[in-house]
Amino acid sequence: MKFDVCVPILGFENVKEVTLEKIDDAFMRMESSNDEHISFTLINPFALREYDFEIPDATQKLLEIDEKSNILILNIAIIQTPVEDTVVNFIGPMIFNTDNNKAAQLVLSESTKYGVAEKISLYLKK
């Protein structure tokens, strides 16, 4: 599924359109539509932990989100070997409106509540 990026991805401001592809129930791959060398592994944060935040009104307007919108929230993960060393960016979620194919990266102000590089091993069941 293709998405127009309405709010730039930090460090990748030239990425204007991405494709999203499901890997499994927890992971997805996001790739730039115009540069195959730019891709990210995304994870469903709700598969790992409790995760909540408010989407600012300005972002809701850009993505045309209302109470009936179908949205998908994913976080960028840096996959490591072993997988327990994988880190997740919880303060920069990607927001996807699947009704109109618009996306944005949000930088949360609650940075003390979530980390930029939290080890996935903190949330895996042992």
From Swiss-Prot:
A Pfam cross-reference name: FliW
NCBIfam families, per the entry: PRK13282.1 (NF009790)
Keywords, comma-separated and alphabetical: Bacterial flagellum biogenesis, Chaperone, Cytoplasm, Translation regulation
Family statement drawn from the similarity comment of this UniProt entry: Belongs to the FliW family.
Any single GO BP term: bacterial-type flagellum assembly
Protein purpose: Acts as an anti-CsrA protein, binds CsrA and prevents it from repressing translation of its target genes, one of which is flagellin. Binds to flagellin and participates in the assembly of the flagellum.
Protein name: Flagellar assembly factor FliW
Quaternary structure and interacting proteins, as annotated: Interacts with translational regulator CsrA and flagellin(s).
